Structure formats: structure tokens, C-alpha cells
């Protein structure tokens, strides 16, 4: 779908920067999952929050150990099936789950670049699909590139990227600041507000 130069630039970042980038985007997708769980009483919306908190912990606490195999297993049961719901909200919720799964797989494999690119694409796809659904039609990549909501999502991804790219080494305060800012904003990538 939508390509962006950010996907090439991510190659310049180190593993911890990729993981932080992915965690930031998952933080912005969390409200989509939490709201879906609340509306449908599906599963435990807090499992996403708990796993994401563990990922932040691995970024900020020296020698933090997490069994991501076990977390991934638990999480797979918390992913809704699109066919079970006649509700648009299931799609952004699934996208949020795909992104968090990518992030966990990156922690298991140690391969962070390709997963960071996938999380970026997943987040932008969530935004683009909502825009097309609201418009009631498919849009070309050219139309989507100039769509204000899509532009805003790219701008936020670039802003996170720049903050991370400016770091010479792992900056715990920056990581904590990003987490706090995104959590306090409480707004998802498609405008859902969900304060925890």
C-alpha cells in the first residue's frame, strides 16, 4: 500500500530505536483495541496494555527479562476474528494486534528493522482504511498521500523517528518521555480517545 521514505531511513537506527519506534506506534493503536473490547465485551482489553508495558520495561529497566514466547501465546487468544463481528471497529483492533505481535516477534528473533517497517505500514493502513471506509470508496495511493489523516499519521511517525534518530545512545529519559506523552494523550492513530 503506502510506501514512505521513513521505511528506508529506519535502516539507520539501532535495534533499541526500532523497538521504541514500534512501542510508540503500538501505544497509538492501543485505544483502537481497548475501545473494541469495551464495546463488544470481547476478552480482556488489559492484556494488550500489560504486554506493551512489559515491552516498555525492557527498554527502560536494565536486565529486565520477559518471556515473549509465553506472552505471545497468551496474546494470540486475545485477537478478535473479523468474521465474528459486524462492526468496523474489529479491523483497527486486529491491526493493533498485528502491530503488537510484530513487536513481540522482533523481541524473539532479534530482527527489528523488518518488524519496525511492518508496524509502520500497519498503522498507516489502519488510517487509510478508515478514510476509504468513511468515503465509501477505494482511493489511489496519490489520493491517500494527500489525505489529511494519512499525512498526520506520517508526520507523527516522522516526529518519533527524528527524536530517536537524534540519540547517540539509548536515552532512557527520552523513552520514558515518549511513553508518558503518548499515554497521556490517550488518542489513537484514528482519533479514538481512550484514557486508561
Over which residues does each language-model region extend?
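Structured binding/interaction patches within domain cores
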Residues: 2, 12-153
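C-terminal auxiliary extensions adjacent to catalytic cores
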Residues: 124-196
Amino acid at each position: 500500500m503506502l510506501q514512505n521514505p521513513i521505511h528506508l531511513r529506519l535502516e539507520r537506527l539501532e535495534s533499541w530505536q526500532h523497538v521504541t519506534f514500534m512501542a510508540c506506534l503500538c501505544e497509538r493503536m492501543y485505544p483502537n483495541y481497548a475501545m473494541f473490547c469495551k464495546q463488544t465485551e470481547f476478552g480482556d482489553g488489559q492484556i494488550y496494555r500489560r504486554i506493551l508495558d512489559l515491552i516498555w520495561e525492557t527498554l527502560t529497566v536494565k536486565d529486565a527479562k520477559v518471556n515473549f514466547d509465553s506472552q505471545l501465546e497468551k496474546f494470540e487468544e486475545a485477537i478478535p476474528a473479523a468474521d465474528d463481528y459486524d462492526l468496523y471497529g474489529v479491523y483497527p483492533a486486529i491491526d493493533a494486534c498485528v502491530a503488537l505481535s510484530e513487536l513481540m516477534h522482533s523481541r524473539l528473533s532479534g530482527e527489528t528493522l523488518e518488524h519496525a517497517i511492518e508496524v509502520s505500514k500497519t498503522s498507516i493502513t489502519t488510517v487509510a482504511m478508515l478514510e476509504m471506509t468513511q468515503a465509501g470508496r477505494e482511493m489511489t495511493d496519490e489520493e491517500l498521500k494527500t489525505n489529511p489523516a494519512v499525512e498526520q499519521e506520517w508526520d507523527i511517525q516522522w516526529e518519533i523517528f527524528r527524536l530517536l534518530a537524534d540519540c547517540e545512545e539509548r536515552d532512557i529519559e527520552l523513552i520514558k518521555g515518549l511513553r508518558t506523552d503518548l499515554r497521556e494523550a490517550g488518542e489513537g492513530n484514528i482519533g479514538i480517545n481512550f484514557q486508561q
